[in-house]
């Protein structure tokens, strides 16, 4: 996986934004319209990345973070890093509230977006996020479990690869032709599905690695917390159950109905800082 900005001409960086060759994955949004030309980068985007220059000091490739999760013995010994992540956005209300929380705490996060939803938010909010030092990664174009995971290993590889291509086209149509992310979070998490080795290889050919999590606020659980302190306790509990690692990747959501996640985030960020964690983002 790339360890720095991807050069123009690699993985489509800097090229005209066109529709992928494969059929468009299922989506609740109207069909994607692409300009067929090079798209100017949104203000704040560092070319060849999913973040701005403010994040250069604390950005890590998805492949590195994933190795830390799968092999805790490889984690840094001399520092603690918290990767706060948000799935299923962006949304004007809840992404905006989380940006306010991050700014007040002096923290940063990685937003795993469903790219068609970027059509619903003002570009200024996305630009603000980049300038604050956050990363804008990919959480799939379709978020359709049946499309992504049904069938054989070959089917899964075909569909996940195609989904990524459409997600990238949509992202570049809004963020600019120089956008690139090496980070993909599977809907439901990679850990939840089987026979994905060929899909992993399909992503790797595109310069992409997957990333799950080892801690959570519980905001998507069927029996989710019902109070702000409960969300913080869930984060503490899940970190403890992961044997208090030096690297934590915390699952949250910034989609509709996640008001309590937004209300709980200041206390979560403050607690992480009190435990000596610095904040990183995932490229």
Task: Annotate each predicted stretch with a short phrase.
Residues 38-153, 170-182:
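Active-site beta->alpha N-cap acidic-glycine motif
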Residues 119-124, 143-251, 255-273, 277-278, ...:
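Catalytic domains of cell-wall/extracellular-matrix polysaccharide-remodeling enzymes
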């Amino acid at each position: 996986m790339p360890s720095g900005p991807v050069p123009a001409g690699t993985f489509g960086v800097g090229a005209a934004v066109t529709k992928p060759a494969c059929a468009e994955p299922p989506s609740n949004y109207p069909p994607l319209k692409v300009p067929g030309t090079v798209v100017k980068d949104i203000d704040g985007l560092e070319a060849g990345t999913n973040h701005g220059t403010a994040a250069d000091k604390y950005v890590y490739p998805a492949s590195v973070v994933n190795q830390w999760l799968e092999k805790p013995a490889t984690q840094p010994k001399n520092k603690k890093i918290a990767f706060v992540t948000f799935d299923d956005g962006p949304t004007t209300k809840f992404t905006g509230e989380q940006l306010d929380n991050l700014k007040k705490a002096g923290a940063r996060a990685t937003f795993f977006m469903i790219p068609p939803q970027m059509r619903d938010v003002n570009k200024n909010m996305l630009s603000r996020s980049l300038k604050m030092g956050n990363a804008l990664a990919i959480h799939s174009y379709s978020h359709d479990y049946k499309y992504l995971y049904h069938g054989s290993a070959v089917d899964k590889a075909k569909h996940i690869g195609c989904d990524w291509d459409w997600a990238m086209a949509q992202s570049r149509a809004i963020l600019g032709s120089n956008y690139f992310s090496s980070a993909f979070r599977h809907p439901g998490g990679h850990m939840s599905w089987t026979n994905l080795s060929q899909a992993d290889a399909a992503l790797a050919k595109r310069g992409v690695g997957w990333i799950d999590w080892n801690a959570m606020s519980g905001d998507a659980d069927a029996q989710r917390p019902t109070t702000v302190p409960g969300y913080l306790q869930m984060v503490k509990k899940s970190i403890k159950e992961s044997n208090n690692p030096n690297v934590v990747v915390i699952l949250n959501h910034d989609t509709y109905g996640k008001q309590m996640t937004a209300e709980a985030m200041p206390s979560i960020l403050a607690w992480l800082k009190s435990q000596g964690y610095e904040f990183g983002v995932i490229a």
